[in-house]
């Protein structure tokens, strides 16, 4: 399938990890925006084949992934730490464990202009930068050389990211010095939203509220953890907005799977064979799985997928509340373990509309922010698709 010497024909299957750009010895690979996401563009290729060797899509086989060894529902025992976490605080516990061993942690943060990127932390207080879910594809390109450098220096490295990002880092570091020091924690993912759309979203609300956004929350828990996916934003002028149609419009674009990367619809990293040593995500269905466990401030499902994962989990025993749960039970209530998001029939139409009309008009047309207009436009598009099928 991938018979060309470089990664230019991976196309829609590309997950945007940037490994190819990093590894190219002649800088022939550039990442360019297409449809709201970064894709590789290859020029003046010298046919060395290095990009193919470290591409997580080309090198993805179930044999290279781990079977789930143990499955749990869990949360961190410290209530205050749990309240500050999006889910059960498991990432904080793992990251703290690594920092205590003089290791380093890589995870997603909000950078300059609210751009989501990966960051290197080697101090316990820096772990707070990673708090909060960020439903935007994070840029990992700047940390790839740092990860390799840390491994070469004998550091214990924890990398946290989506399954495709974890697969990318493992592909890149495989065979490098001290590879056994790399520990990976994958965050369960149901498709990565566009950084371009999020940038437009931030610019729009800054314009409307005449102030710079200082923080953005995709999972505001002021009304409890179960009230999930409520957005909020804080501005430098002190304004705090919460759960309005403008903010929730962005959520609707994601929920409708318009604002999801093309490769996510055929995700190669889903299922019981996992990329990471540990897998963490929200545990939905907790009232049916374990109604006696207190999930008021969040609870996580945790999959332990390797001997490294088992070792770390055992070290956290005194810090966590947990219960062993059969994997099939978790799958029953957490579809992200089983299937990828479904591609909308008008997915390409959405991106053409966005490219032509911009974010605000797209939001009005494709989300509740548009009110009655939204409903009418959706109905018209549905009629058009029906007529096309009949013709």
Regions found by a protein language model. Give the residues of each.
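Short, flexible loop segments at boundaries between secondary-structure elements
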Residues: 180-204
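Long, compositionally biased charged/polar accessory segments in the mid-to-C-terminal portions
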Residues: 101-104, 206, 211-391
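Conserved nucleotide-cofactor-binding alpha/beta core module
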Residues: 134-158, 163-184
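Gly/Ser/Thr-rich loops at beta-strand to alpha-helix junctions
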Residues: 87-89, 112, 159-169, 191-193
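Flanking helices and flexible, charged tails adjoining ferredoxin-like Fe-S electron-transfer domains
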Residues: 1-4, 47-153, 328-365
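Iron-sulfur cluster-binding cysteine motifs and their immediate structural context
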Residues: 9-13, 19-41, 50-67, 277-278
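Short, intrinsically disordered, charge-biased short linear motifs at domain edges
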Residues: 1-4, 8-11, 40-43, 246-255
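Local cysteine-cluster metal-coordination motifs and their immediate loop/turn environment
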Residues: 12-26, 46-58, 162-168, 260-272
């Amino acid at each position: 399938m991938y018979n060309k010497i470089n990664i230019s024909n991976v196309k829609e299957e590309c997950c945007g990890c940037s490994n190819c750009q990093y590894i190219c010895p002649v800088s022939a690979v550039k990442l360019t925006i297409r449809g709201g996401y970064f894709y590789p563009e290859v020029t003046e290729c010298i046919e060395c084949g290095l990009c193919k060797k470290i591409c997580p899509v080309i090198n993805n086989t179930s044999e290279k992934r781990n079977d789930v060894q143990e499955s749990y529902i869990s949360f961190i025992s410290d209530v205050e730490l749990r309240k500050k976490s999006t889910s059960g605080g498991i990432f904080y516990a793992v990251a703290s464990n690594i920092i205590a061993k003089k290791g380093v942690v890589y995870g997603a943060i909000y950078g300059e202009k609210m751009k989501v990127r990966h960051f290197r932390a080697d101090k316990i207080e820096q772990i707070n930068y990673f708090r909060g879910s960020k439903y935007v594809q994070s840029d990992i390109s700047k940390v790839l050389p740092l990860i390799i450098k840390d491994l070469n220096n004998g550091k214990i490295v924890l990398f946290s990211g989506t399954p495709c990002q974890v697969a990318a880092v493992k592909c890149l570091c495989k065979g490098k010095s001290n590879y056994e020091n790399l520990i990976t924690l994958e965050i369960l993912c149901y498709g990565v939203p566009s950084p371009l759309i999020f940038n437009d979203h931030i610019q729009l609300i800054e314009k409307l509220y005449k102030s710079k956004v200082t923080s953005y929350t995709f999972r505001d828990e002021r009304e409890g953890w179960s009230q999930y996916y409520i957005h909020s934003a804080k501005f430098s002028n002190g304004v705090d907005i919460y759960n309005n149609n403008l903010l929730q419009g962005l959520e609707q674009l994601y929920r409708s799977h318009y604002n999801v990367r093309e490769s996510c619809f055929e995700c190669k990293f889903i299922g019981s064979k996992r990329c990471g040593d540990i897998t963490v995500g929200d545990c939905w269905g907790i009232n049916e799985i374990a109604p006696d466990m207190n999930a008021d401030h969040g609870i996580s499902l945790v999959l332990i997928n390797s001997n490294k994962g088992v070792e770390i989990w055992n070290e956290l025993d005194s810090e966590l509340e947990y219960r062993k749960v059969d994997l099939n039970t978790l799958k029953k209530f957490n579809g992200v373990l089983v299937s990828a998001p479904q591609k909308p029939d008008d997915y390409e139409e959405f991106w053409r509309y966005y490219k032509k009309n911009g974010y605000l008009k797209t939001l009005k047309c494709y989300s509740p922010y548009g009110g009655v207009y939204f409903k009418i436009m959706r109905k018209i598009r549905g009629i058009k698709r029906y007529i096309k099928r009949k013709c």
